[in-house]
């Protein structure tokens, strides 16, 4: 079975090339080609034909193909359905902002978390993505769209911290000066609240932004919509977040979906304010996007504004997320891993 060359760091690639009798500078040439979008060794024109044939016999550099591309008529958001080498599919989204272009990528095929308001978890987890498959979503989204990517959010299909090792390697690859060279401060990683992995991430002391999907400040309602809360209740999760902030100095963003009758009461706003006090936290409020299977509904505009006002009155920074790509089901919680019948 051929090795996945694009999942290797430059140092690993240099060692692999040395093991087959090739100089290190060749590895750097290949690394650069791969991270510029080369999909075959034949495209690497500064390599000899014999070396290209040799590498092709040893390594797999198969790129994903575009199974479907949708462009929002509302705001130009682009959603890609990528077909992977094994036939599985994942989605990623390119969003245009005044401050630059952001790509939202998936970390797994399917998702193990079971959140009731999210389409990505329907059907459960199939497999974790390889580092190369994360890189390719960023790279080929940029190449196909023609929009230079300046920011990455790991908020697509899957739980990034459930795929911890591969995601950490992806971060190293995407941050490499010889690769796409996207700075850590331009990367956001979202988690549903895997406390053990948050603790592990804190030890890495990375300069990325950690986004925690909270969605409720009380265990009763959070457990109903997020099964992970039964293992790591709200207070346990927030203790890990405080420790993360203390170790890294990086402010945490809390994702908070506004769900009618579930997470939007004034009492919950007061409780959330109390539990986040002193953390320098930012609350990113998200109107629930439609997922037919969930049976849940977004909060009223009045409830959303009242909730936000209570947070701000208590000294908690809160913003309302702008919804992009809603006409192509590209908004938060709407990504799926396969074609939908129409």
Tell me the role of every PLM-derived stretch.
Residues 1-88, 242-251, 256-342:
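Auxiliary Fe-S-binding modules of radical SAM enzymes
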Residues 72, 106-107, 120, 190, ...:
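Short linear Ser/Thr-Pro motifs
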Residues 73, 85, 96-98, 193, ...:
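A generic beta-sheet turn/junction motif
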Residues 89-94:
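A short loop-to-beta-strand scaffold at the N-terminal edge of the catalytic core in hydrolase folds
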Residues 96-133:
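Canonical Radical SAM [4Fe-4S] cluster-binding loop centered on the CxxxCxxC motif
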Residues 121-151:
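Conserved alpha-helical substructure of the radical SAM core
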Residues 142-151, 156-319:
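Conserved AdoMet/S-adenosylmethionine-binding subsite of the radical SAM
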């Amino acid at each position: 079975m051929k090795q996945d060359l694009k999942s290797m760091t430059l140092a690993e690639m240099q060692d692999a090339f040395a093991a087959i009798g090739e100089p290190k500078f060749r590895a750097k040439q290949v690394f650069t080609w791969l991270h510029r979008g080369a999909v075959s060794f034949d495209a690497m024109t500064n390599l000899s034909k014999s070396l290209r044939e040799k590498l092709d016999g040893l390594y797999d550099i198969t790129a994903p193909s575009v199974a479907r591309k949708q462009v929002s008529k509302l705001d130009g958001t682009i959603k890609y359905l990528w077909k992977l080498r094994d036939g599985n599919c994942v989605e990623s989204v390119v969003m245009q902002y005044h401050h630059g272009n952001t790509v939202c990528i998936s970390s797994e095929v399917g998702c193990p978390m079971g959140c009731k308001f999210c389409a990505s978890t329907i059907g459960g987890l199939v497999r974790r993505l390889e580092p190369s498959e994360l890189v390719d979503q960023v790279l080929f989204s940029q190449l196909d769209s023609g929009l230079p990517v300046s920011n990455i959010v790991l908020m697509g299909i899957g739980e990034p911290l459930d795929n911890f090792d591969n995601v950490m390697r992806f971060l190293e690859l995407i941050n490499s000066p010889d690769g796409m060279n996207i700075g850590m401060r331009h990367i956001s990683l979202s988690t549903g609240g895997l406390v053990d992995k948050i603790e592990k991430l804190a030890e890495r002391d990375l300069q990325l932004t950690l986004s925690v999907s909270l969605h409720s400040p009380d265990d009763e309602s959070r457990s109903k919509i997020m099964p992970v809360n039964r293992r790591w209740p709200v207070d346990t999760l927030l203790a890990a977040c405080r420790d993360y902030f203390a170790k890294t100095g990086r402010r945490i963003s809390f994702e908070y979906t506004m769900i009618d009758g579930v997470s939007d009461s004034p009492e919950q706003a007061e409780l959330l304010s109390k539990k986040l006090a002193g953390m320098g936290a930012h609350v990113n409020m998200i109107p629930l996007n439609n997922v037919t299977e969930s049976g849940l509904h977004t909060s009223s505009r009045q409830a959303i504004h009242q909730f936000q006002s209570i947070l701000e009155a208590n000294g908690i920074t809160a913003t309302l997320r702008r919804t992009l790509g809603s006409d192509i089901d590209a908004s938060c919680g709407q990504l799926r891993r396969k074609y939908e019948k129409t």
